[in-house]
């Protein structure tokens, strides 16, 4: 598993968003990026996280942040999730797990004593030059946007 650190160059990727449009991290050079990895569309924790970012999107955008969500759900599931909760930011479909493995967030998890493989919820804060400014492991889903503001390293 890849281990990324603060100060590392954020790995570039190209995939598709919920509209089937190409999206690459490199196209956001010059902006601060909130790249958040989450396990599954329309589940309680993931919905709380997405809605918190949605509810604070204007504030984050006003401070120069671009929000991008990534999970290994399909384009169709992402579109349904976007529509249901009126999400104003791209959701990247990483069905083949290339991006989650590139960022080292795909691995063993445990639930009720059973081990399984999945995405470990993690948020990467990426600066305007494409470097990792901070990493929020196990973010607080209900307060993700405040964590972004509190943990951005100026």
Task: Pin down the residues of each PLM region.
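Chalcogenol-based redox active-site neighborhoods
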Residues: 1-154
